Amino acid sequence: VPFDDETQAPEESVGDVRWSSTKIGDLAADAGIGRIHVLAWRDLDDVEAGGSELHASAVAARWAAAGIDVVMRTSHAAGSPPRARRDGYEVVRHAGRYLIFPRAVAAELLGRHGRRDALVEIWNGVPFLSPLWARGRRATWLHHVHEDMWPMVLPPKLARAGQLLERRIAPPFYRRTPIVTLSESSRSHILDRLRLPADNVHVVPPGIDPGFSPGTEAP
C-alpha cells in the first residue's frame, strides 16, 4: 500500500531478529514471487494477540528481509494507527473483529492493496474463504481446529454456527488448497476433524527465536 506524505506509516519493531535471508530470497525469485498479501484476523498489536499473530509477524519479517514486499491486512487494534510498517512489512488495520472478513475480501477483489504474486490466508476459526475468490498462488495457515473453543468466546447459538462453519461448511472449499500447520499433532487433528486430503496438509515447524538460548544449570 503506497503512503503519501500525510499518511506515512510509522516504523514499528518487535525486537531483534537475526537470520539469513539468502535462501528465502532465492526461492521466491525462482518462483516469481515478489509480493505477498497476508490476510489475518488480528494484528500483533491487538491486546488479545497470541501465538498466531506472533508467528505471522515473524514470518512476514523474514520474507521482508529477503526482499519480498509483504502487505498484512488485519482488523484494527486499539491505540494503533490504521497503517504502519513493522520490521520491513506493511500492516493495514481496518474494520472490526467481524467486518474484517468481508472487507478484506472486498479490498483484494478491488485491488486496493495493489498487485500480488501470492496470497496467504490465516484461518483462525473463521475463514476468509480464499478458494472461492482468489486466483493464482495461495496457501492457508491453519494452526489448529478451534472446535471446543467456540463456546468459550461466543454465545451458544453463535458458537454452534462457528462450529458448523469450521467443520462442515468451509472444509470442502479447501480440498485443493495447500494447508500449512505447525506440528504433526495439529495435522492429525485437522485431518481427523476437517477431513481434508492428507497430501495437501503440510507441517512446517515454527522454530525457536534465536533470542532464546539454553541457560546454565541451577546450582
Predicted regions and their residues:
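Membrane-proximal helix-turn-helix segments that form the acceptor-binding/catalytic region
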Residues: K157-V180
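Carbohydrate-associated surface elements
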Residues: S185, G207
